[in-house]
């Protein structure tokens, strides 16, 4: 399978002037900003435009910054509340993405001369900016489903 994410992404020099970043820093100090940047890095590294946040991701962030998992969850919830991540996708699907994340993904794809494909149920940018999704691959085991675990705020659930 081809790599979906990126090895690098651009960071705007005026990001510290963003009111959302200021609110995050005021509430959670440097820890909040560190968690946000870690998750943002994972979004671009793994899939390019979203992250299905799992218990493993929660552990990784917590372990990397040496903070409680509950605090990580609270910080991510606050990031969704203030609009750094899409609140609806976070609450309903445990997915971390946002309009600005997807716009940056599209920009990076253009520079890399790569088709920008965003799943319909996750797309927050206008449809004309993204390439049509390729048809799904046939199942190796027809009729069998293997549910993936994901985090839905407040509980674990099968996908």
Task: Map each language-model feature to its residues.
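Short recognition helix of helix-turn-helix/winged-helix DNA-binding domains
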Residues: 1-47
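Winged-helix/helix-turn-helix nucleic-acid-interaction surface
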Residues: 1-10, 58-59, 65-159
């Amino acid at each position: 399978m081809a790599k979906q994410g990126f090895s690098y992404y651009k960071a705007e020099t005026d990001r510290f002037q963003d009111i959302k970043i200021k609110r995050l820093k005021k509430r959670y100090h440097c820890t909040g900003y560190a968690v946000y940047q870690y998750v943002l890095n994972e979004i671009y590294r793994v899939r390019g435009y979203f992250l299905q946040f799992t218990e493993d991701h929660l552990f990784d962030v917590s372990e990397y910054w040496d903070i409680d998992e509950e605090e990580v969850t609270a910080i991510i919830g606050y990031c969704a509340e203030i609009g750094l991540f899409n609140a609806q996708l976070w609450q309903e699907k445990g997915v971390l993405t946002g309009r600005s994340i997807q716009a940056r993904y599209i920009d990076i794809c253009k520079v890399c001369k790569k088709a920008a494909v965003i799943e319909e149920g996750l797309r927050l940018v206008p449809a004309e900016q993204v390439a049509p999704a390729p048809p799904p691959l046939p199942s190796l085991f027809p009729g069998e489903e293997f549910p993936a675990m994901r985090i839905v705020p407040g509980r674990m659930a099968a996908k």
